[in-house]
């Protein structure tokens, strides 16, 4: 095949740092993979990770759990959301996010997003007025950060609890404030394709002592909460202990040992991702029928993937994506009629009540998604650009 072709799989995962490998080996040598115990050494890996996250964000508390989905479920539950309550959710998100709400027995009400994949503030206000929600679970899906000043103002004005899904924005900020710090809690993911790769895991950050205590207890502390990295006061723990079921959502020692060293090098990886993103954006700008969603000036993003919107009929998009795939650049498309890996959208979720989402549906119809390993070279990015230009440049 003549012309550009990417030889390196975009699904490849950069190597773990040596410190993560050493930490994992130490855990395996000890055979202590469970975070709690009646006779445990001081400073378990999970407790150290919790302290490191709290220090990184400047929060009083961080709670480590077994997945980003569990983090959202526990944050909502611990903030006081109960079965039957309405929880708003922006329509551009991934299945684990409405799944966390459904897991709680609450009702998902979707909110429209604009052409740049950010929550539409007018529709958010309309949904608040109409549905009187208990909470808004704001998903910073694929790293697209909303107008947080507007979101916070609406939530505060109407008494709506704000929980942030920051699975794709560890290291991003709005107006100098990191995502995860705008509401009652921020929820992060440690899944392989995120900024920190522990295979699976989640972190809740919060300054709310009651929320932290409830999350620790519900995650399954076995009354060994004093071994937690950022423990709330005993009075607050005892207030909630009789009322809180053990949902068994703890993070394990192996995942924490792998994750902890990666937090120290987070900004280095995010800088690499930003350079990759900017080079790709610059390379495809000006292509016909194709645009890149705009990032707000107040936002410092932390992209792990790249999105663009194509204004073509479905068959035209399909044909061009086939060209890209043949040349080693597989591109996901949110506009497919059926759900595929990591790209399901609201119309695929039969458990969520349908609602008119004209702006979101218009952008999702042509939304394409490219995974970006953080160690892509400039030459590899240029090859991706060349393949996309070959496919879409006519």
Locate predicted features.
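Active-site region of PLP-dependent enzymes
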Residues: 169-175, 182-304
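Conserved PLP-binding active-site segment in aminotransferase class I/II-type PLP enzymes
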Residues: 1-69, 73-78, 156, 364-365, ...
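Conserved PLP-binding active-site segment of the aspartate aminotransferase-like
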Residues: 294-296, 303-313, 342-352, 365-377
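Conserved PLP cofactor-binding pocket of PLP-dependent enzymes
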Residues: 223-235, 279-283, 320-357, 362-367, ...
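Conserved PLP-anchoring active-site segment centered on the Schiff-base-forming lysine
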Residues: 73-128
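Generic structural signal for small/hydrophobic residues in well-ordered secondary structure
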Residues: 24, 53, 71, 87, ...
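Short, conserved charged micro-motifs
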Residues: 313-320, 376-382
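Active-site phosphate-binding strand-loop segment of PLP-dependent enzymes
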Residues: 116-198, 203-213
């Amino acid at each position: 095949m003549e012309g550009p072709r990417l030889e390196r799989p975009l699904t490849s995962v950069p190597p773990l740092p040596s410190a993560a490998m050493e930490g994992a080996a130490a855990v395996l040598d000890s055979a202590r993979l469970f975070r709690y115990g009646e006779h445990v050494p001081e400073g378990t890996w999970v407790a150290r990770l919790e302290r490191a996250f709290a220090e990184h964000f400047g929060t009083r508390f961080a709670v480590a759990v077994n997945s980003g989905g569990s983090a959202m479920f526990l944050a909502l539950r611990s903030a006081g959301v109960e079965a039957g309550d309405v929880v708003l959710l922006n329509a551009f998100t991934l299945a684990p996010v409405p799944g966390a709400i459904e897991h709680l027995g609450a009702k998902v009400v979707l909110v429209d997003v604009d052409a740049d994949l950010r929550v539409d503030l007018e529709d958010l206000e309309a949904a608040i007025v109409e549905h009187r929600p208990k909470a808004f679970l704001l998903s910073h899906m694929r790293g697209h950060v909303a107008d947080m000043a507007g979101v916070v103002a609406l939530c505060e004005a109407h008494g709506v609890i704000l929980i942030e899904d920051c699975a794709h924005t560890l290291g991003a900020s709005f107006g100098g404030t990191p995502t995860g710090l705008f509401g009652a809690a921020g929820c992060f993911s440690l899944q392989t394709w995120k900024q920190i790769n522990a295979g699976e895991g989640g972190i809740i950050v919060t300054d709310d002592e009651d929320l932290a205590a409830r999350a620790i207890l519900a995650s399954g502390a076995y009354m060994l909460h004093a071994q937690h990295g950022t423990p709330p006061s005993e009075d607050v723990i005892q207030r909630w202990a009789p009322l809180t079921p053990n949902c068994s959502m703890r993070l394990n020692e192996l995942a924490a040992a792998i994750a902890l060293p990666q937090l120290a090098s987070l900004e280095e990886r995010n800088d690499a991702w930003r350079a990759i993103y900017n080079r790709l954006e610059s390379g495809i700008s000006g292509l016909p029928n194709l645009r890149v969603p705009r990032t707000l000036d107040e936002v410092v993003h932390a992209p792990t993937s790249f999105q663009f919107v194509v204004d073509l009929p479905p068959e035209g998009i399909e044909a061009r994506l086939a060209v890209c795939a043949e040349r080693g650049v597989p591109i996901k498309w949110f506009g497919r009629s059926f759900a595929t890996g990591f790209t399901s959208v609201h119309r695929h979720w039969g458990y969520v009540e349908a609602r008119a989402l004209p702006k979101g549906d218009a952008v999702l119809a042509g939304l394409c998604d490219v995974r970006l390993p953080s160690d892509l070279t400039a030459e590899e990015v240029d090859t991706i650009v060349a393949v996309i230009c070959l496919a879409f440049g006519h």
